[in-house]
Structure formats: C-alpha cells, structure tokens
Amino acid sequence: MRVLDNLTLTIGSGQHTAILGPNGAGKTTLINLLTREDYALPRPDGVPPVKIFGNAIWDVFELRTRLGIVTTDLHQSLVEGHSVGRITGEEAVLSGFFATRGFLLYATVTSDLRRRAADALARMEALPLAGKPLNEMSTGEARRVLIARALVTSPEALVLDEPAAGLDLVARHRFMESIGRLANDGTTIVLVTHHVEEIIPAVEQVVLLQRGRVAAAGPKPSMLTSHHLSRIFDAPVSIEKMNGYYYSRL
C-alpha cells in the first residue's frame, strides 16, 4: 500500500514551513522518512527519492546534530516508555547528545555537555525543570524539555510533529509563542500538524497534504483559505486571521 504517492516537496534553509493535512494524509510517514524509520521506494530514473541538506546518504547520528525532530512517539517513549518517566529534565536533554531514549548508563557526561543542556533548557524557559522527573511534569512542561533536547546539538532545522497536542488554550498559545522565538533566532522551523491554530506567524510556506499527495503548496496567505482547507478536510471550513494566527471553524 502506498502511503505517499509521487510526493515532491522542497523546504529551503530558513524557510519556516507548515505541513498541514487531515489524519491519514501521510504526515507521520513523511516524518519517518526524515528520521530514517521508513525508506522511500527507489525511483526508476535513479534519482535519490529523499535528500536532506542536499545529501541522500547520511550517518543517522550525524544527521541528528543538524536536524532536530520532536514527535509524539518520542514523548510517549520518554515519559511513558521503558524508563517510566524516571529520568529528569536534564537527563532527557543530555540524552539528545547520544541519541538515546532513556538513562545515560554508559555515556560520559562532561561539564560542557551539562552547560549546553542548561542553555537549551533556558531557551525553552524550562531550566527550573532540570531536576524534575518527566512523569511529574505537565504535558506542556514535558514538551518544552523535549524541544530543548532537540535543540541541544544546535541543529539547523527543527521538525515538530503536532507540537501543541494535549495542551489547553492558554498553554498552547504560550508554547507556540516560544516556538516563534526559536524561528526568529534563526532555527528553521517545520511544523507538521492538522490544526491551523498551531501555525505560527513566522511560517512563510504552507504545504497541504491529502491522501499521500501534495494537494497545494505556496505562501501562507494563499494556502490558508476556506477553499483549500474545505477541500483537503472534506468539510466546509471557515478561516479567520487574528494577530498573525489563523483560526478555523466549521
């Protein structure tokens, strides 16, 4: 079964982008291609089907130093997985240096690594969470820590899958404002979501996915319209813009 079919997508460095689509559109598979959890079928013409930073072949550990990715799977793995959330905020961020998902049993953690972890937590306004176990954090707190984990290697780009899932209205707004600050600081942001409300003002390009294909792509104002969204969500969607954000309703 083809989940993504003849999908062509280019995101330039510094081009903040939102990938928007309903459930089943292929968003998760697209992320898995970036993380090398899934692999695309070879093209008949021999052209590499996926390139990241211009390269088709990557050492996964090297790639993770340039591309930070935060997914709901990572959240569940660290907070609800084998470690049962017993690791602290600092330990979670430090694990980003070693691409591990749990305790740092065999890693050598230097004072420099701890300093960089503290800096990453501070960027997400999460430094007070350094000593707090993940399973005692709210959803919003844990999400900030996981993004700090992705930032700790100073990546060029950050891919966020449903970044505000599980947050209430106030927490979501504050959280997305912090993502906006990262964008303004020079980190390329790629938001993958099915919520229009999660698209921060800094986003310039929107890609609309539907049934594994790019239904439309272009500048944000021309993509976030009632016409386009009603088509990909297969329902009458109205759009309103306020303070740089877009809001949808049926």
Task: Give residue ranges: language-model regions.
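Conserved ABC ATPase "signature" region
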Residues: 94, 98, 108-129
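Conserved ABC ATPase signature
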Residues: 107-108, 133-137
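Conserved catalytic motifs of ABC-family nucleotide-binding domains
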Residues: 154
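Catalytic Walker B motif of ABC-type/P-loop ATPase nucleotide-binding domains
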Residues: 158-162
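H-loop/switch region of ABC-family ATPase nucleotide-binding domains
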Residues: 193-194
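H-loop (His-switch) and adjacent beta-strand-loop-beta switch element
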Residues: 206-219
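ABC ATPase nucleotide-binding domains
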Residues: 226, 230-250
